[in-house]
Structure formats: C-alpha cells, structure tokens
Amino acid sequence: MSETITVNCPTCGKTVVWGEISPFRPFCSKRCQLIDLGEWAAEEKRIPSSGDLSESDDWSEEPK
C-alpha cells in the first residue's frame, strides 16, 4: 500500500491530501487558490532575485 501524502494549504494552513481527490492542490479550495493568485498579481509575493534590476537600462531598440 502507498502512503497518503498530505500538505498544508499555503493560504490557510488546512491539511490537504496530495492526490486526485484534491483538484486544487496544494490549496484546499478554489477560494484559497484565488487568494494566492491575487497576492501574486498585486505583487505582494515575489521570487527573490540576487540580480540587479537595472540590467534593463542597457537594453535599447536602437542599434548602437
């Protein structure tokens, strides 16, 4: 028998079974999934970067 894997919902912390029984995994519900999406869209969450964000200053559409 295989062991049932569970994770915590990243939004509310509720336990979620990792499998086809949970269509919104790792979220417990569509609501928690949409809350998380909204946080990313509002830039409340971001992936840390070690690079300098000013790299785009060197980009130009005009040939040098």
Swiss-Prot record:
Cofactor: Zn(2+)
Record: residues binding Zn(2+): 9, 12, 28, 32
Entries under InterPro entries matching the protein: DNA_gyrase_inhibitor_YacG, Znf_NHR/GATA
Ranges of Acidic residues composition bias in the record: 54-64
SUPFAM superfamilies: Glucocorticoid receptor-like (DNA-binding domain)
One GO term of the biological process aspect: regulation of DNA-templated transcription
Region listing for Disordered, in residue ranges: 45-64
Gene3D superfamilies: Erythroid Transcription Factor GATA-1, subunit A (3.30.50.10)
Keyword annotations of the record: Metal-binding, Zinc
PANTHER family: DNA GYRASE INHIBITOR YACG
Family, per entry: Belongs to the DNA gyrase inhibitor YacG family.
Protein name: DNA gyrase inhibitor YacG
Organism of derivation: Escherichia fergusonii (strain ATCC 35469 / DSM 13698 / CCUG 18766 / IAM 14443 / JCM 21226 / LMG 7866 / NBRC 102419 / NCTC 12128 / CDC 0568-73)
Protein's gene: yacG
